[in-house]
C-alpha cells in the first residue's frame, strides 16, 4: 500500500479523476491543488489526520470522498468547493456539530455553505485601478472635459447562491454590497453616472438620496433623456441593458437597432424643439454618450453595428433567421436598397475602451469577458483618460474564481472615461466652450432588460 505520493503526480495536470483510496496515506501535500481539472477525487480508507487548505482551490471538484480516515477537523476552505455534489465523510471522528450538519437533508450543501460563510477573509484590500491618461487638454482650445461612469451594480434579486455559489452569503447580501457599490461610485466621482440593474426600491432608498447629497440629479424613467447645458448645446446621454442569454445574439442585435432607432427619434424631436436656432436637422449633430451592458463581446454583431455604423443583413448573429423586412424599419438612414444589404445608422460612435485595455468587465466563474461599454460621438468628442483594469495578478494570488467577492460588490467592474467635448459649430466666428457645472447627472437602468429603459 502507498504511504506517500510522488511529486511527479502533480505534473499530470490533465487528470480529471484520481483514485488513491485504500492506501496508508497519512497526509496529502498542498501540491494536489496543481491538478485543477480534477472532478473526482477518492481519498477514502487511508490514515489522513488533516487536509491541506489548498484543497479548497480545486473548484472543479464534483465528488470528494474522504470516508474512513482519521479526520477530526476540516479546513473551512472546503467551503469554496461550490460545485461539489458528493462529499463522503463517514467513518471519521469529526465533531458532533459537523456531523449533525452533514447528516441533515442536503447536508453536503449546508455544510459547505457553513464553512464558506465562516471562512476568514484575507484582510488585504482591493488595489487601486490605475488611471490612464491618453491626452492632455489644450488650454488654447475651448473644450469641455467631463467624466462618465458605466456600472452594472448586480441587483439584489439576482445575487443568489445558486448563481454565485463561490461567494459567502453575507457578502451577497445587499446591505453589505451596497456599501462597496456606493464607495465605488463616490470614489469615481463622475459627472455622469449610468447604472444598470437598479431596483426601484433601491433607487429611491439608496441611490437617489445618497447621490443628491453629492450634487447629482437622478433620472429613473422609461426612456433615454437629453439634458440641455447652459442653453448652448444639447447632449444626449443614453443607458441600456441588453438581453443576457448568449444563445440569443439575434435578439441583442435587434434590441440594439431598436435602441438606436429610438435615439434617432429623440434627437429629431430635440432638434425640432430648438426651432430656427438649429443649424441642421441631422440627428447625428447632437453629441451622444451611450453607456450599456450589452451582454455582447467586442467581436459581436452588436458592437460591430455600433462601431461601424451598420451590419450586413446576413450577419451570422442573425442566425440565418429571416429578419430582412423587419430590419429595414430600424435603419436609421431609412429603408435600404437591395444592393446595400446592410442595416445602418448615422451616429458615428466609438468605444472609449479600445483594444485589449480591459480583458474583462464581467468576471464570474463561468464567464470572464468584456460586455460593458461607453460609446461616444467621435465627431464631437475624444477620450482624454480612462480608468484601467484591476490587476489580474491580485485576483489569481487571492484565488478569486469569480465575483462578487467580499472585496468586490458586483460581478461587473465599473468603467470610467474622461471625455473632451468639442465646441459646437456656430454661425459666429467665435467659439463657445461647453461648461458642465454641478448638478451632475446619474442615469439608472431599471431591473428589466428593455433597451429603452435607461
Roles of regions detected by a PLM:
Residues 5-8, 28-30, 51-53, 74-77, ...:
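The feature encodes a structural signal of leucine-rich repeats
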Residues 15-20, 38-43, 64-66, 87-89:
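Conserved hydrophobic beta-strand positions in leucine-rich repeat
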Residues 76, 96, 111, 122, ...:
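Metal-dependent phosphoester-hydrolase catalytic domains
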Residues 139-148, 157, 228-241, 381, ...:
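Beta-strand-turn-beta hairpins that frame and shape the catalytic cleft
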Residues 10-14, 33-37, 56-60, 80-84, ...:
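Leucine-rich repeat
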Amino acid at each position: 500500500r502507498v504511504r506517500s505520493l510522488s511529486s511527479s503526480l502533480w505534473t499530470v495536470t490533465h487528470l480529471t479523476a484520481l483514485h488513491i483510496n485504500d492506501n496508508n496515506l497519512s497526509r496529502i501535500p498542498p501540491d494536489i491543488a496543481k491538478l485543477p481539472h480534477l472532478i473526482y477525487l477518492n481519498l477514502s480508507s487511508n490514515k489522513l489526520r488533516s487536509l491541506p487548505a489548498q484543497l479548497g482551490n480545486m473548484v472543479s471538484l464534483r465528488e470528494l470522498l474522504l470516508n474512513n480516515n482519521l479526520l477530526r477537523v476540516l479546513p473551512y476552505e472546503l467551503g469554496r468547493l461550490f460545485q461539489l455534489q458528493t462529499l463522503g465523510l463517514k467513518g471519521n471522528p469529526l465533531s458532533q456539530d459537523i456531523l449533525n450538519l452533514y447528516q441533515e437533508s442536503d447536508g453536503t450543501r449546508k455544510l459547505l455553505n457553513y464553512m464558506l460563510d465562516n471562512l476568514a477573509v484575507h484582510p488585504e484590500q482591493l488595489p487601486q485601478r490605475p488611471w490612464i491618461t491618453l491626452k492632455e487638454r489644450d488650454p488654447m482650445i475651448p473644450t469641455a472635459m467631463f467624466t462618465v461612469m458605466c456600472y452594472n451594480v448586480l441587483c439584489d434579486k439576482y445575487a443568489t447562491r445558486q448563481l454565485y455559489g463561490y461567494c459567502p452569503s453575507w457578502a451577497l447580501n445587499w446591505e453589505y454590497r451596497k456599501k462597496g457599490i456606493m464607495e465605488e461610485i463616490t470614489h469615481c466621482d463622475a459627472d455622469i453616472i449610468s447604472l444598470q440593474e437598479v431596483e426601484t426600491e433601491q433607487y429611491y432608498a439608496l441611490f437617489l438620496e445618497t447621490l443628491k447629497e453629492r450634487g447629482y440629479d437622478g433620472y429613473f424613467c422609461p426612456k433615454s433623456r437629453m439634458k440641455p447645458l447652459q442653453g448652448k448645446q444639447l447632449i444626449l446621454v443614453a443607458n441600456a441593458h441588453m438581453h443576457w442569454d448568449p444563445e440569443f445574439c439575434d435578439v441583442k442585435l435587434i434590441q440594439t437597432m431598436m435602441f438606436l432607432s429610438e435615439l434617432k427619434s429623440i434627437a429629431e424631436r430635440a432638434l425640432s424643439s430648438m426651432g430656427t436656432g438649429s443649424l441642421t436637422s441631422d440627428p447625428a449633430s447632437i453629441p451622444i454618450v451611450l453607456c450599456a451592458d450589452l451582454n455582447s463581446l467586442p467581436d459581436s454583431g452588436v458592437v460591430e453595428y455600433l462601431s461601424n455604423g451598420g451590419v450586413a443583413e446576413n450577419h451570422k448573429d442573425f442566425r440565418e433567421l429571416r429578419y430582412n423586412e423587419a430590419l429595414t424599419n430600424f435603419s436609421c438612414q431609412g429603408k435600404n436598397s437591395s444592393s446595400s444589404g446592410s442595416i445602418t445608422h448615422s451616429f458615428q460612435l466609438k468605444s472609449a475602451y479600445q483594444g485589449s485595455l480591459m480583458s474583462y468587465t464581467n468576471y464570474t466563474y463561468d464567464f470572464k469577458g468584456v460586455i460593458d461599454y461607453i460609446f461616444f460621438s467621435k465627431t464631437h468628442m475624444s477620450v482624454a483618460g480612462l480608468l484601467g483594469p484591476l490587476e489580474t495578478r491580485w485576483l489569481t494570488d487571492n484565488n478569486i474564481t469569480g465575483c462578487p467577492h467580499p472585496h468586490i460588490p458586483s460581478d461587473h467592474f465599473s468603467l470610467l472615461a474622461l471625455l473632451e467635448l468639442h465646441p459646437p459649430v456656430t454661425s459666429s466666428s467665435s467659439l463657445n466652450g461647453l461648461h458642465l457645472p454641478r448638478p451632475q447627472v446619474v442615469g439608472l437602468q431599471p431591473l428589466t432588460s428593455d433597451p429603452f429603459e435607461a
